[in-house]
A protein has these predicted regions:
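Acidic, serine/threonine-rich, low-complexity C-terminal transcriptional regulatory domains
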Residues: 52, 57, 61-97
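Low-complexity basic/metal-binding stretches
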Residues: 94-106, 110-111
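Acidic/Ser/Thr/Pro-rich low-complexity tail/linker regions in eukaryotic proteins
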Residues: 2-43, 47-54, 62, 67-69, ...
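Conserved residues at the C-terminal ends of beta-strands
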Residues: 59, 101, 116
Length: 544
């Protein structure tokens, strides 16, 4: 019995892993009954040999609450979540093999020994231990609810080869116990596994993913089909999901996580690490550096240029990643990220706060903003030209278009704001338009018509946007952070124009040619590269 095992002793010494040749250590889970001690052995292999193994993905839980397992005959302490997952998965793996090689993610067996995480692309499959339905565990839910949630997802998914979604109508609208199903699925999605950074790799890169909660199982493919079927059902029937209904809420949350995983799974189809960072920004990590490092392992090309180093602080990690992306891709998408991520006083204005720990666990809409950026052409096909003359300063080559002389809030941010307030806000914008006539750069109707077309497509990110006018009569909109006397720039490698604010560093009192990055913007008449054809002087702009 496990309770009769001696107290956990220090684990046996291991020979160092050959990280230069991408050597990893595998855990062999030995067969046994539920009551038997969890026993394992280890071996080392080279990734280049394409070893076949499964990855165990689980949420750590409280590191101070442990249970003993036998490793190479020695008793060692592991977290209670890992212990429960190994014990629960032992009979599942036994059905496949007499003993099976496993990568138990983030166990003390190899923590710190693996610096490059790209080897997950060779995984045969992965088991995601979402939780347990018995015992004193942090990630626990009643067995009946676990079974009900998995069974409902299986029913929503239907047969893998079926093209019909007729069954979805009954499951979503007429099943008597629908309320109970929704509650059970809510409990399942509340388990810690869904919100952790390090669980993403195991869900994205392997060939097959199995979610396990207690004795219940479901594949990621089935969850994906369930989500697709629900979306197709609402589309085909021309029905609108209840905006605030419990069914809509729980399925939307499921869809959000599945789509986030899908975004990451499309990295070979053109999506890049910036999409990945935003897709999983709501996931949590014990170490804030892992907000970057957990994603980095899924992009081996970038990982070759950026070493995983926990001696660096979060500012260094975020700065290094940005400069790496500019060097590799030749564009300034990272500056856009700096403008939309939460501000951190320890970071220069041009560095994205990629290590930010978001409190809520629902992703936002930044992925759509990145897609919008990718369609831009303000700097034509230029490649970013940058230099880093000193710590905290980024010199960027480009042109200065004009200075902002008037701005007006686009519309109120709250749906509860009275129409009178919105009308007055718009009247202020109309009253400022005569500046355009004085400069003679655009016609009134051209500007209004084009900008209304653009505003129809604005999403929630722009609810706090403002419309501005420059000294030469250019009209555009930008984030609410914009101020009068800010300047509009087109920077080499920047697909959208950027707003900069003249600034000064405290340590450089005599120099006033620094700029703080404010936000990106849209300016009528320069979005197709026109500003680079006006003969404006090319300049280096020093961002701080």
């Amino acid at each position: 019995m496990i309770g009769s095992q001696p107290a956990a002793r220090s684990p046996p010494a291991y020979s160092p892993l050959d990280t230069q040749r991408e050597q990893i250590r595998l855990l062999h889970l030995l067969p046994g009954s539920w009551e038997d001690p969890v026993s394992c052995t280890t071996s080392t292999v080279y990734v280049s040999d394409n070893p076949v193994f499964e990855s165990l993905s689980y949420a750590w839980g409280d590191p101070s609450v442990t249970r003993p397992v036998l490793l190479n005959g020695h008793a060692i302490a592991v977290t209670v979540n890992l212990f429960a997952a190994l014990r629960r998965l032992r009979p599942i793996w036994r059905r496949k093999h007499a003993r099976y090689r496993s990568w138990a993610k983030s166990t003390p067996l190899h923590r710190g020994g693996i610096l490059w995480l790209g080897e997950y692309s060779e995984l045969l499959s992965v088991s995601a231990a979402a939780g347990e339905n018995r015992g004193q565990l942090e990630n626990v839910m009643p067995k009946a609810n676990a079974v009900e949630a998995f069974e409902w997802l299986h029913r929503l998914a239907g047969a893998p080869d079926s093209k019909s979604i007729s069954h979805v109508d009954y499951e979503l609208t007429r099943r008597p116990e629908i309320s109970s199903c929704v509650t059970s699925l809510q409990m399942l999605l509340s388990l810690p596994w869904w919100s952790r950074m390090w669980t993403l790799q195991e869900a994205v890169l392997p060939q097959g993913v199995i979610f396990v909660c207690g004795s219940s199982e479901i594949t990621l493919g089935a969850i994906d089909r369930a989500q697709d079927n629900c979306i197709e059902y609402w589309t085909v029937t021309a029905r609108q999901e209840p905006r605030y209904g419990p069914v809509n809420h729980v399925l939307d949350r499921l869809s959000t996580w599945v789509m986030a995983i899908a975004h990451l799974g499309e990295i070979e189809e053109g999506r890049d690490i910036v999409h990945a960072l935003f897709s999983c920004k709501a996931r949590q990590a014990t170490n804030p550096r892992d907000k970057v490092y957990a994603v980095l392992g899924m992009f081996p090309v970038i990982a070759r240029y950026m070493e995983v180093d926990y001696s660096k602080d979060t500012s260094q990690v975020s700065t290094e990643l940005l400069l790496c992306l500019i060097t590799l891709h030749g564009d300034l998408k990272g500056l856009l990220c700096a403008a939309v991520t939460p501000k951190d006083p320890s970071l220069p204005s041009w560095v994205p706060n990629w290590c930010y720990m978001q409190e809520d666990n629902m992703p936002g809409g930044e992925v759509g903003l990145i897609d919008e950026y990718d369609e831009g052409f303000a700097a034509q096909l230029t490649t970013a030209q940058v230099r880093t003359p000193c710590h905290g300063v980024l010199d960027v080559l480009g042109v200065s278009v004009d200075t902002v002389i008037a701005l007006q809030s686009l519309h109120a941010t709250s749906s509860q704001t009275p129409a009178r307030v919105i009308t007055e806000s718009f009247r202020g914008w109309i009253d400022s338009l005569p500046v355009c006539f004085a400069q003679g750069t655009n016609t009134y109707l051209d500007i209004i018509g084009h900008m209304i077309d653009r505003m129809r497509n604005l999403n929630h990110r722009h609810r706090e946007a403002c419309i501005f006018i420059t000294g030469q009569g250019h009209v555009g909109y930008a984030g609410h952070e914009m101020r009068i006397n800010d300047t509009v720039h087109v920077l080499f490698g920047g697909k959208l124009p950027f707003v900069l604010r003249p600034s000064r560093r405290p340590q450089d009192q005599l120099r006033d040619q620094y700029y703080a990055l404010v936000c990106h913007c849209y300016v009528h008449g320069i979005m197709n590269g026109e500003a680079l054809e006006w003969g404006l002087k090319l300049q280096w702009f020093s961002l701080v």
